[in-house]
């Protein structure tokens, strides 16, 4: 029997059944428990959601920026009041430790919503003088109905990252959470309604990416799609968005990010950063620094420091306060990660720790994989070239700065990168040569609301967060005004 009642769709401020009456299961990856039967949305449900969103958007866009900001801030307050309740739901659905979801997921999502609430009244156009009798002014107008398609690793945070700038600009959003972790987006929709968001301005359709997800990208009355997920799926989304109605797209896709440890680095600090950049959230973070470059002469010392820190990993029941490392998000994903680990072993990489599923006692019921470090890696190995999205660190030795930069850039991805060195001139020199959209110096992983997030190359298009994101949810209308006589050539 499922822990929660059957989960419906959320359309026009209320829960409704899916037209097909079909469902799928949401599973707790820590123990295999069925959390809920969840409605599978189809074409008729999407049409209903679009019509609802169009109605709600007209009301929402007619409000002033200050009025929209007040409602958004009420939602922020509700999110913070219910932080622990939402964190537990997120832990059950994702397998992430409660210590993590309580301190990161809802808090950082609420921060982004508050940030864009502050920007909503500041959306403005320009006045451009042409001559004494004429000028141009511009208006930043909402796109209308937009869509967000979320990933499974940060369900409510990603929903807020996409909804916040869209709502600030006066749009309505249809959001599809990942079918792997669908529960918290529905609670977010309830909170938005309670805060006073007009019906239809935030609708949630649960279901598969291949099903309702594909229908969303094709719908001619949806003006934009913001997608977070893998590169292969992102390419399909972009092709469908362009082929249907030339939709605008924002995409945050995969990564295989390099972390360069310089020869003058504090190795204790570098080891702390490397472990956080690979094992936080059980390695299921898009920006993880999975390719760690270390000077050849420091490799043995650095390996020892990494192993010291792995001893501090407390794998366990995600609901226990002491746990800081939970299961992977699903059993299917666990199998994928284990396959990559097997490929690494077969290719000749040397295992320093982990490299296997954890099956002792109660862990046999969950999707637990031990933190894994490979050394003696080469750039042509699949564990070095392909995104694993799990707790797998690949250690690569290098001889000089130019070599490290060249090899760091030798990838189809360009999401994130980092460097560890006390020499700030060197740090900036290296960072400026790295082909990545998000970079860190002597730290890793923080993505505050003010910081634009997005990738180079095949890691994405556009940006989320920061002022830059707001422009992706508006369109510019130019208006010329003539105060003098009109001179016709006819």
UniProtKB/Swiss-Prot annotation:
K(+) 1 binds at residues 26-27, 93, 180. PROSITE patterns: ALDEHYDE_DEHYDR_CYS (PS00070), ALDEHYDE_DEHYDR_GLU (PS00687). CDD domains: ALDH_F9_TMBADH (cd07090). This is Betaine aldehyde dehydrogenase. It comes from Stutzerimonas stutzeri (strain A1501) (Pseudomonas stutzeri). Its EC number is 1.2.1.8. The keyword Membrane does not apply. Involved in the biosynthesis of the osmoprotectant glycine betaine. Catalyzes the irreversible oxidation of betaine aldehyde to the corresponding acid. Disulfide bonds: none annotated. Keywords: Metal-binding, NAD, NADP, Oxidation, Oxidoreductase, Potassium. InterPro entries: Ald_DH/histidinol_DH (IPR016161), Ald_DH_C (IPR016163), Ald_DH_CS_CYS (IPR016160), Ald_DH_CS_GLU (IPR029510), Ald_DH_N (IPR016162), Aldehyde_DH_dom (IPR015590), BADH (IPR011264).
